[in-house]
């Protein structure tokens, strides 16, 4: 099974993603959640997820900074960025390939 890490500072988003997606149908499981990029980095070290779903705008460390920090150590991780920003150029700064 693929392990998924969800990082968002809105608990309702984390819980909604956990409950609304039929993870097992896609051979996935939500291995953990975090409420900011710093917590996400710590969870990465413990869980070694295959897929990261993260908000862009969070306190302490935003999603873009977290993705930049993990890219060298986890080059094969699949990343999905969540954003409420209308201007997609902000999300493109993540340089996701």
Model feature map: region roles:
Residues 23-27, 73-75:
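Short helix-capping segments at alpha-helix termini
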Residues 41-97:
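CheY-like receiver
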Residues 25-30, 47:
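A generic structural motif
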Residues 7-8, 34, 52:
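Conserved sequence signature across two-component system core domains
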Residues 31-38:
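Conserved Asp/Asn-Gly motif in the active-site loop of CheY-like receiver
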Residues 30-31, 79:
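Hydrophobic/aromatic residues located in beta-strands of well-ordered beta-sheets
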Residues 2-13, 17-18:
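Conserved acidic segment of CheY-like receiver
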């Amino acid at each position: 099974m693929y392990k998924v890490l969800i990082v968002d500072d809105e608990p309702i988003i984390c819980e909604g993603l956990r409950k609304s997606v039929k993870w097992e149908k896609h051979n996935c499981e939500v291995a953990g959640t975090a409420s900011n990029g710093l917590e996400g980095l710590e969870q990465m070290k413990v869980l070694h997820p295959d897929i990261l779903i993260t908000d862009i705008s969070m306190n302490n460390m935003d999603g873009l900074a977290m993705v930049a920090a993990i890219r060298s150590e986890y080059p094969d991780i699949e990343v999905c960025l969540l954003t409420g920003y209308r201007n997609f150029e902000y999300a493109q700064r993540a340089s996701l390939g």
